[in-house]
From Swiss-Prot:
Superkingdom of the source species: Eukaryota
Native source organism of the sequence: Candida glabrata (strain ATCC 2001 / BCRC 20586 / JCM 3761 / NBRC 0622 / NRRL Y-65 / CBS 138) (Yeast)
Stretches with biased composition (Polar residues): 178-193
The organism's taxonomic lineage, starting at the top: Eukaryota, Fungi, Dikarya, Ascomycota, Saccharomycotina
Protein name per UniProt: Protein ROT1
Keywords, in A-Z order: Endoplasmic reticulum, Glycoprotein, Membrane, Signal, Transmembrane, Transmembrane helix
Cleavable signal peptide: 1-21
Coiled coil: none
Length: 263
């Protein structure tokens, strides 16, 4: 009972509303399987990597950058074999207003969404750019009295609480805080409040068509590669490799020794 009371006192004492410094870090939902950073999105090959379980993660830096990783699955009551899944990546700058409102301004050209509806898309997932400004009416951080960990509670624009997020990393685990996939003619972040498809430019349109043809499996195929980096090196096809040189040297030294002994 004393321990519970202590945690309760700590949570009340540690309750902070609207303090940007307390946002710093990587926060993850209860599943503890979704985290921002290179384990969720590969900006080089533009691959979204499917976590083991659904969840959401936010990261914040001291200089005003944020990153979001979301993996949501919604069931289909009429057909349980047809759940819809969505993977979303965004990053950009955040703004904290005087009234405690937190606004996330994503970089327009960097957001990505992979949407899968197996009973409607014939097994072909849709991969598009994504740009969604997010507004949180307020937030607070505190020590959870049950788990004893730092907790971030975000409140939606209407005041409804989101599921709590728990501190996973501090400093945060994030991709570089800069535009990752710049395009010609891009002018920075212009949030629209809704998801967007590829640019209307012909080259981007062609790229979008190609991406849409890829399956979910193809987009997440590098999951294990990214999580468990290999230390393998490229094998040389030349006969003059290290093993050849070593055995040749050994043979020559041995032959020379025999000649010296017999002479």
């Amino acid at each position: 009972m004393v321990r519970s009371l202590l945690f309760a006192l700590l949570s009340v004492a540690g309750l902070v509303a609207g303090d940007a410094a307390d946002l710093v870090g990587t926060w993850s939902s209860k599943s503890n399987q979704v985290f921002t950073g290179p384990g969720f999105y590969d900006p080089i090959d533009e691959l979204l990597i499917e976590p083991a379980l659904p969840g959401i993660s936010y990261s914040f830096t001291e200089d005003g950058w944020f990153e979001e990783a979301s993996y949501q699955v919604s069931g289909n009551p009429k057909n349980p074999a047809c759940p819809k899944a969505s993977l979303i990546y965004q990053h950009g700058k955040f703004e904290l207003l005087d009234n405690g409102t937190l606004i996330l301004h994503p970089i327009e050209v960097d957001g990505r969404q992979l949407f899968s509806d197996p009973c409607s898309d014939n097994g072909i997932s849709t991969y598009t750019r994504y740009n969604q400004t997010e507004v949180f009416k307020s937030f607070e951080t505190f020590i959870d009295p049950y788990h004893g960990v730092y907790t971030l509670q975000l409140y939606q624009f209407n005041g409804a609480p989101l599921p709590p997020l728990y501190l996973a990393y501090r400093p945060p685990m994030m991709l570089p805080t800069e535009t990752l996939n710049p395009t010609d003619g891009s002018t920075g972040s212009h949030p629209t409040g809704s998801s967007e498809s590829e640019s209307q430019e012909s080259d981007d349109t062609s790229k979008r068509s190609l991406l849409k043809k890829r399956s979910l499996r193809e987009h997440v195929k590098r999951s294990l590669e990214n999580r468990y980096k290999t230390n393998a090196v490229k094998k040389s096809d030349s006969i003059f490799n290290a093993a050849f040189v070593w055995y040749t040297s050994f043979f020559l030294v041995g032959a020379g020794s025999l000649i010296f002994i017999s002479s």
